[in-house]
Swiss-Prot record:
Residues where ATP binds: G9, L10, S11, G12, G13, V14, D15, S16, M35, G119
Classification via Pfam families: tRNA_Me_trans, tRNA_Me_trans_C, tRNA_Me_trans_M
Catalytic machinery residues: C95 (nucleophile), C189 (cysteine persulfide intermediate)
Site (Interaction with tRNA): H120, Q323
Membrane-spanning ranges: none
One GO process term, biological-process aspect: tRNA wobble position uridine thiolation
Localization per record: Cytoplasm
Entry keyword set: ATP-binding, Cytoplasm, Disulfide bond, Nucleotide-binding, RNA-binding, Transferase, tRNA processing, tRNA-binding
Protein name (database record): tRNA-specific 2-thiouridylase MnmA
Family annotation (InterPro entries): MnmA-like (IPR004506), MnmA-like_C (IPR046885), MnmA-like_central (IPR046884), MnmA-like_central_sf (IPR023382), Rossmann-like_a/b/a_fold (IPR014729)
Reactions this protein catalyses: S-sulfanyl-L-cysteinyl-[protein] + uridine(34) in tRNA + AH2 + ATP = 2-thiouridine(34) in tRNA + L-cysteinyl-[protein] + A + AMP + diphosphate + H(+)
UniProt key word Cytoplasm: yes
Positions of region (Interaction with tRNA): 137-139, 291-292
Amino acid sequence: MTKGKVLVGLSGGVDSTVTAVLLQKEGYEVEGVYMRLHDKPGYHEDNWGKVQKVADYLRIKVHFHDLSEAFNANVYEYFVESYKKGLTPNPCVMCNRTIKFGKMVEFADTLGIEFVATGHYLQCDGNYIYAAEDAGKDQSYFLSEVKKEVLPRLLFPLGTWIKDDVKAYAANIDVLKEFATQAESSEICFVENSYDEVLAKHMNIDMPGETVDTQGNVVGTHKGYMHYTIGKRRGFFVNGAHDPHFVIDIKPESNQIVVGTREKLEENAFEVKQINLFEDLVEFDCEVKVRYRTRAVPCHIKIEGERATVVLTEPVFGLAKEQVAAFYDGRRLLGGGVIC
């Protein structure tokens, strides 16, 4: 008797491949799905071939599911429009909420499949998400906006694995050896080299403008506001500057960037919108990560209406509007919100 049916998101990479192998060994009836999300040249032909190889090895059914229209509406356009507004979006978080753990779950429903799995490095007990054992690969941050209703259906077998062990496991299976040595995929799947190249397909991003200080005085020049994010310290000119200067604000309406020394980036409190919590909380203490690769900082959160105020016990640097703040209680993810 099987543990139930599970739909595994297969990308052609080692993580999703080993995920499918492990779940089958654990007694699940596995089906795979390859999700076509964008039109990156040559991307899908190669990966679909790898997915079919995995399906043949495991003798499982695999589906090719075109979600490019939904991805474009929920992720790609959000990415482009956010940069137009001088914001710094996190497309991976929105993709996880709307596509991988939104549309993929809906697709599982049409197939009569109870569980959904991916090769993400994190853990889930059906009620909460937890950080992975491999701290360097932990991806729990990116699921802070996933709807709590889907948590009981999610499986993440790599949450207790170390990345090197995953590669070694694949290398010991003759048919899957090539998966162990292939290059890691990029963080943002539709970006080939840099986000600038994506934006340049839709608008003119090379618009030289003024660099100003916090008092509004013109102190230099820059190459176009969409080239910058909060905290960036290169790519613009400041007259007579001896200390490093950083972007501390972006003004798209005037094509200006505001710069200052590092202490100007310091923030002790901020607000979030689009609050997503895995339990009913109104006012609570926890830790918050304001970017993926940052340390969690203790804080106090108070929710009022559709927004929450986050007061920090120590300052953070480089808060960027539209980035995601993920809330933790130790390794347990409580949810998150979008910085505003």
